[in-house]
Amino acid sequence: MKDEVDRYLEFYGKDNINGFFFDEIASDTLKQVNYMKEIFDYVKGKSKSNLVIANPGAPITDAISPYADIFVTSEVSANVYVNKFEKPKSDFEKNKVNAKHIWHIVHSANPKEYARIIRLSRERNAGWLMITDDVMPNPYDREPSKFVEMVNMINK
């Protein structure tokens, strides 16, 4: 992973990179936590201002919480987000002061559900939110319907 970070910095130029998004991270074992710490320290060693986003797509442990600036702690369909949300396990996620470090991604949402999802994200301490009505297998390949209306709802 460090080589990959270096390749990006070399190719794009360190002044053109503001951070890194690490997908599919895990935090179940000490080895996984230590690996994320190593990556986090390496990226921050390149520039303290680099943003580190880690995406486990699920609740995190307190052990890993220091090793990213933002964690994607929920990446699910609107149905799951509304009806079967996996509650946080860590004190980190439950602490309101950490909302700025928590990001929820909700796909397959009907635009009529946007307001409800926004309300739930606030109740669930997510300071960052992405909603799309796009669906699997790649729900991130187009702009969400009613995007401007959604942004206005979020900014209320």
Regions found by a protein language model. Name each.
Residues 1-156:
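Glycan-processing catalytic domains of CAZymes
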